Amino acid sequence: MSEKIALGLGDNTDYEIVWNSAVFENLIRRHDIRVAELATDKPIASERDLVISILGFLRAGSGGERHVAASAIVEDFARHFAMKITLGGTSVRAAIAMRKLGHTSALHLVTINEHVRRLIPQDSPYVCSNTVDSSFPHLIVQFDKGMRVCAGDIDICSSRANRIIYHDDTDNVIMRLNEGFGDLITGAKVFLVSGFNAMRDEQLLVDRLASVQRMLARLPADAQV
């Protein structure tokens, strides 16, 4: 049966850590990080690089999204903190919110794993473009105004609250699509298209948009996109 609401196209697992200045101060000492090294635009190839980046954002009071060299960096770093595993992606978060209001949605996913199966609305039909389980977690770092970190020659305090996202998400970079999603949306009244922001290859993006156009052709003529 076709749902009235169709949501796509990407999804991911979020590791939402609980800010802990004492942990950051220990990491500063462990990695011998100096204030002159703090920056928000350096490549992130190690835990040390990640700490430098987070502290750079904290000092600037700004937020952003950055690529890390490997998901293992995110996995290892997150273990230092209390954290909550949630789902990310505009479409999946919208589906979860609308289910609380009594509405089900058809979902297109690019990542499937135990967390996705557990956390998506259980009565919302979905297709996934991946045939095997995968995990490319997004590290979600949120800090409030006035968060202070003091260790070595570093003494910084955030001027405002903000949020930073770090990941190496192959599934969302490639954004493989499953055109079988068209079978779930033939009666949809609205189709939310999102998730292309992680893509880097122009020709691959062109190919994916052509796939989206073919899926859109399965919608009723009066559907909103």
Predicted segments, located by residue:
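Ribokinase/PfkB-type carbohydrate-kinase core domain
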Residues: M1-V225
